[in-house]
Amino acid sequence: MYPYPNEIGRYGEFGGKFVPETLMRPLEEIETAFKELKNDPVFHAEYKKLLFDYSGRPTALTFADRVSEYLGGAKIYLKREDLNHTGSHKINNALGQILLAKKMGKTKIIAETGAGQHGVAAATAAAKFGFKCTVFMGEEDVARQSLNVFRMKLLGAEVVPVTSGNGTLKDATNEAIRYWVQHCEDHFYLIGSVVGPHPYPYIVREFQKIIGEEAKEQLRRVEGTLPDKVVACVGGGSNAMGIFQAFLDEDTELIGAEAAGKGIDTPLHAATIAKGTLGVIHGSMTYLIQDQYGQIIEPYSISAGLDYPGIGPEHAYLHKSGRVTYESVTDDEAIAALRLLSETEGILPAIESAHALAKAFEMAKDMDKDKIILVSLSGRGDKDVHTLMNVLENGVGTHV
């Protein structure tokens, strides 16, 4: 039985709580409340009802027959988190945490967002429960994800552009934590990925593991077996932990697809496992992209949801233990995979999800036709249309 996190919030040497003293008590209160509610049947019933009646679960498992035939190898199945209310897996966690905040007596939430999907999910959950919502978002991401910014505002959230650093997810998270330090008495920090100080990586994983649980049962029903490989994109890593969790104790190969940007041998990438070293970011010990002096190197990816310089501590442990393999996918490879899926299956994936698709497509070609690859299609690509228009005008991503 998989034993992590341990009682002090560690995954081997990774994880923990590296935060100002001001936040130790709020974190302990959140951990205590979550432990109490985790096994509460009333809480579970309320959460499941929201997922089924409001978010639209269970999400579909789609056999990508035309792209599988085109590649000539393994069968490719897609776990369709893009079909969730708000368009991605992020709503699974947002609804869980807003319920937790409600049980703790909070009425205000703060959130960070990169691609805007978590911001939209948090704003949606806040609107549903009548909470005040403040979302921190890097100014670079505000520009490239303007549709999601407008969606958040329509949902009643305040969006705070962050101008420090590169104006991306890391910087938005920094500002969200600073704000929480000053307002932790009446605000709940609704974090969006399996990152940050304990208990957040654990909480987010628990609210996302329904992805893998559903997919496992659905695939057994359709194929009578488990997948040979499971592939998911990894920034912070919540959709990946959500789908991997159900297969950790199975004989299934697990692959995380990181953002290689312009290439891992250039300065323009967000490949934390490939190029990172041990350090502390946002309250957690993990791998991060840093220089010899411990200063964080600004990450880059065409995908706003993957350009994070760290990775969830559980992913760091799973890499070091060898249980999960992490591979890098460039911008061009992701865009090519996005185009192929769109043109063969009529499904427009998020650029984040396209990183997982690219790796799955590459592997499928060299596998027998009776083998199965399960891909976490973490979100839909509507939010990326402006980015895609700019990129494709330059002829990027024209082949797989």
Swiss-Prot record:
The modification N6-(pyridoxal phosphate)lysine is found at residue 90. It catalyses: (1S,2R)-1-C-(indol-3-yl)glycerol 3-phosphate + L-serine = D-glyceraldehyde 3-phosphate + L-tryptophan + H2O. One of its GO terms (molecular function) is tryptophan synthase activity. Belongs to the TrpB family. The beta subunit is responsible for the synthesis of L-tryptophan from indole and L-serine. Signal peptide: none annotated. PROSITE patterns: TRP_SYNTHASE_BETA. Pathway: Amino-acid biosynthesis; L-tryptophan biosynthesis; L-tryptophan from chorismate: step 5/5. The keyword Amino-acid biosynthesis applies. InterPro entries: Trp_synth_b_CS (IPR006653), Trp_synth_beta (IPR006654), Trp_synth_beta/beta-like (IPR023026), TrpB-like_PALP (IPR001926), TrpB-like_PALP_sf (IPR036052). It comes from the Bacteria. Pfam families: PALP. Gene3D superfamilies: 3.40.50.1100. GO terms for cellular component: cytoplasm. This is Tryptophan synthase beta chain. Keywords: Amino-acid biosynthesis, Aromatic amino acid biosynthesis, Lyase, Pyridoxal phosphate, Tryptophan biosynthesis. PANTHER family: TRYPTOPHAN SYNTHASE (PTHR48077:SF3), TRYPTOPHAN SYNTHASE-RELATED (PTHR48077). Its cofactor is pyridoxal 5'-phosphate. Tetramer of two alpha and two beta chains.
